[in-house]
Amino acid sequence: MPQTMQHHLPESLVLVIFGGSGDLTKRKLIPSLYQLFKQDKLPIRFSVLGLGRTEYSDVAYREHLDEALQRYLSDGEYDASLAEQFLSGVYYLPMDPASAEDYPKLREQLKTLDERINNPGHYIYYLSTPPSLYGVIPQHLASVGLNEEGEEDTNGEPSAIRRIVIEKPFGYDLQSARELNEIYRKSFHEHQLYRIDHFLGKETVQDIMALRFANGIFEPLWNRNYIERVEITAVENMGIESRGGFYDQTGALRDMVQNHLAQLVALTAMEPPVQFNADLFRNEVVKVYQSFRPMTPEEIRRRVVRGQYTESEWKGEHQRAYREEDKIASDSRTETFVAMKLYIDNWRWQGVPFYIRTGKMMPTKVTEIVIHFKPTPHRVFATADGSTVPNQLVIRIQPNEGISLKFAAKVPGSGFEVKKVSMDFTYDQQMGGLASGDAYSRLLEDCMLGDPTLFTRSDAVEMSWRFFDPILDLWKEEDFPLYGYPAGTWGPKQSDLIIEREHSWTNPCRNLTHSELYCEL
């Protein structure tokens, strides 16, 4: 495969964070930018401008972020001297992102920063705000000319870089996604839009492509002839925490399935691009979404299960039900669990079921893909109980990131009994581990480089919503069941029914080499 396209870091840049006083900024964005600063991966002349309704002076804002760095960086990563250097380029502007009257003030503040760091107007806008502001901010930026890139030079580079990063969810359904795309098209070009999905910033997610397309031993087997089924799990062992107001309007399907899990399905199922560049890679993602087999209402009822966690005794204490959480209605029908069986109608995957699930308050926190290969056509060897050993490839996204190949080996001694063994690759042992803030650091760096490969394109957003919309519509009917499951369990028992009769979900634990356990290690 030809080499990746080359992208260049500008010499100067201002990163403008809408929602600069919010949770995402202090937990993820600032720690990730600090990591890039330590690695000399930021532009030579770089500033951050935080925006928000909270009143901060520049000094108070830096102190607030310094506390966040000490709290959210991994042990040993915080350096007081480096943090001071990094934060010296951070500024704050109190303003209301929803108010058009405040944007001339933003424009003037950016001019001041441009003069301070000799910046020709290169800006990246990061929308770390409630989704209700996603349609407002681009229009207000355009009203004061902060969307315009200017004339291109002989290398095709604009005189002023203007990019905008939008957090998920991008739309609430297909119609709202289309409307949002139309709003952005009026103010920005597609190449300026970076719809971020932090799952794609994880090294282990990107390693799916390396595993498939950089190794000749896997790709010949990566099809309906050798793979029996694919299973993708992304679950958490905590509830909604302080996100009650947001989560009750969103639910697990919008929060996780339509974006994160759909992307994992696409990376697992996509065809190899001719070369690894943004458009060719994203074209293949869209083709997978186009191949999702639509489900009739009857098929949705058989193949999709939704659930909501109920109270239980777990971890030695009482766990309250979802409906007892803060800012949640006592009769809420918002799902905290989704399990689904879907098919991809194309040459490679025809007839192979993809089982996906996500949930809150599960026994452990884990995201992994399990490729189940078909058994041998004739059983020559068997285990002690007479069964055959299935071949599986486990791709652990998080935690204990790595890849494990499960296969049969002969038990030493007389006879020909076999047992399941594994060959394991872990990032900790062979790559020196992964830095904290890894996913956001990678995606922020890509955005500054102008590489949109790992960001979602508008047509992919709409194609994904096109598949999931009928499910959401059917859920509006009162008779569609919402099953309860005790907090700390693997979801409603009804989710087992969507797996083929002879199969069951793989319930992993956090230790890659002991995937049949589901304890928290």
Predicted regions and their residues:
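Secretory/organelle targeting and membrane-embedding segments
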Residues: 1-166, 170-521
